[in-house]
Structures are given as C-alpha cells and as structure tokens.
Amino acid sequence: MVGATKSKRMHARNAAAVAAAGALAVGIVSIPAAPAHAADTITATDQAYFGYYGLDRARAKGYTGKGVTIAMIDGKVDTSVPELAGANITVKIPCTITTSPSVESHGTGVASILVSADYGVAPKVSLLAYQGRFGGNGDRGASDCDQPGGVGKDSQPWLLNSAMNDGAQIINLSASTPNEYKELKWVTARAIAQQVILVNAAGNDSTNDDDTSLSKWSGVVGVSAIGVDDNRQNYSSWGQGVVTASIGGPFSFHDLASGEVTQGSGTSFSTPVVTGVLALAKQRWPEATSNQLLQLLVKTGLNPDHGWNQYTGFGAIDPGAILNTDPSQFPDENPLMEKQGGSSPTLEEVQQYADGVVDPTDIVNDNSYTYRGLDESMLEDSLNVYPTHLGTSPRYHRK
C-alpha cells in the first residue's frame, strides 16, 4: 500500500485473510518508497509514464478524454491538493468510513494519474471518485454502511453498481477483491451487457493473484506492471485475468500525513494509466463500442503477434497504436469473455442477466434491473427490492 509508512509493504493478501474473517477487506496494491522531496508541486517530468508514453503529444492533438466519464473506487480523494486543481471530480461518499491518511493518499494519487492538469493521462474526463472501505488497511465502516443481506454500501459490488448507476463508462479499481462475493458475477455480467469497461490492478505479490483479483472475471481488464526498460516488474502479480501492462512507477504523489511528496510503484499506478488511455480512445473513436475498444486494446498489445501470457496479457499497452487504429474494423464482441482456463460470467450467464431471470436477491444496488423470471416467491421475498414482472423475460418470447 502507498502511504505514510515507507518501510512497510501492505500486501494484497491482507484482503483475503481479513475478508475470510467476515469483514470487508480490500488490500490496496502499490509499493511505498522513500520520500522524494518536500516541494509542493508535482510536474509531468516527475512521472515516469508521462514521457514514456509521449502524453504531451496526445494532448497537443486534443486527446484529453473530454466527454468521457470515469469512475474510481479507492481511498477518499482529497481534491485540495495542487495537482488536482481544476479537475472535474465528484467525490462520492456512500456512508461513514473511518480511514487513514495513507488510504486517502493512495486514492488521491490514483485520481491524479487520471485527471491532473499537469500529468493526468485524461485530464478532461469527468471523474466520479467513490470512497470504498479497505479493511486490510485499517478502514472501518459505521452502521450506516450496513444493508440487508450483508453486502454493505462500502462493498465493491455495491460501489461498482453505484458507478454504473451514475453513468460511468470506465471504472478503475486499483485494489484487490474479496471474491467470496457471489454478487460480483452479476456486477460483471451487467458491465458486459451494458458495455461498461472494468479495469483492475493485478496485485503486487509477485505470485498468481487470481483469487484476490476482480480481473479473474470475464470482461475485466487486468493490468500488470512494467518498467521504463519495458520489462515486467518483479513485484507484479500474474494470472488468467491479466490482459495488458503499463508503467507502474516510480510515481510521485503527496503523502497526506506529512505533506511531503513521496514516490511509489505498483499495479495500483499502472492501472489508471490503462484506464486513462481507454478514455482517450473513447474520445478519439466516439462511434466505436466498448467491445470494439477492448478488441483494439487486445489487438495492439505489444506481445509478439499479440499473443497472450499470464504476465503481461496480450502485451503492454501501446497508446500510439490505440489512437491511430480505427476500431470499427473489429467485431462488436467482448474479447475477454472466456479467459485462459475458463471464466465467469459466461455468455449464457450474461444473457440471463440481460433477460432478467437472475435471482434478484443476488444483485445489489442495480437501478437497471427488473426481475422477469417465473419464481413467484420473489413477489414476497423481503430481500427482493427490484421491480418484478413475472413471465415477461424476452427469452420466453423469442422465436
């Protein structure tokens, strides 16, 4: 985790351990380093990814992400830091969460990679910044976070659906995931059906982190980390969910506890780079579907012949190729539906969601869902909070 404690690495594995004990715990995935300097100003020259990807040239051509809405689920974003001055950020606090400066530093840093006027990848996007609860890093939620059924307002399923409810087109999650949530399957099914792109950090355990990664699910863009030497970073985790890679640091950000500018590296920071580039692609290719943009990401990856491996996916991201290759030539099909070794939701499960026949008690905070199945007990189930129209699913009327 990035934060005030520079000598201690917070592992994403903390998430699995605490979540298994019945608490929401999401390990924030980045690695701290020593303080860089105490100056207030952070510039593009301080950020390894900015020059590496030639983002000044993208800006010169007008590619800023204008008109695109990104959401992030992370620590609370402090919009008062100088690097976020003028950025279009709406901070969303779902309930009362007791947190720490280190978690807020992480969220604020991730936001700055996305939208900083000085060094943001997509400085003109509209950013919805949702505060989550990261129990593995000491966060605690108050009773107003609780919901019937046990999936609270501070949980990932709830917040991912909040972002889609609010119109997010791309969602950044620089954190690991307690995958015991069965609701995550239907969150990702919704994202696939509605063509919302989910982007997730692979982790920093230098191991196969599928068990604590949202990116193990179909449709999700898992991001590992490379260095400016183009090599995969030793800390970067891997697995079937990895789709691409980008520069993971060193990244300069404000430590909100000390006020100093510090540095860190990790897939927490490689992930918003990918999210930002996808926002640039949405602006550059407004007629393309999100499925076609994912096809573009896969087909421009820098692995030889765009082949897949568990370390860098289809290869490191190539923003230049993405902004210069028309995705309309690619099929309007999600290329991440069946990940290596199999993944869920399947196409049939996505169709079940779209047809409204998924058990509504397995779905949380989804303002687009209507149950259209045949189970009459749903009419009386107190946990079913969705409109219910029995027998009206399109699957019952297709010829």
Where are each of the predicted segments found?
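Secretory targeting and sorting signals
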Residues: 1-38
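N-terminal domain-start motif of subtilase-like serine proteases
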Residues: 42-70, 93-99, 318
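Subtilisin-like serine protease catalytic core
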Residues: 59-70, 76-89, 98-150, 218, ...
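Structural recognition of the beta-strand scaffold that forms the well-ordered cores
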Residues: 69-73, 126-131, 164, 169-174, ...
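Extracellular S/T/G-rich loop segment that most often corresponds to the catalytic His/Ser-adjacent loop
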Residues: 74, 212-283, 287
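Solvent-exposed loop/turn segments at secondary-structure junctions
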Residues: 75-79, 95-98, 119, 133-137, ...
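Substrate-binding/access-modulating region of protease and related hydrolase catalytic domains
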Residues: 136-215, 262-265
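C-terminal subdomain of the subtilisin-like protease fold in secreted/lumenal serine endopeptidases
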Residues: 234, 285-398
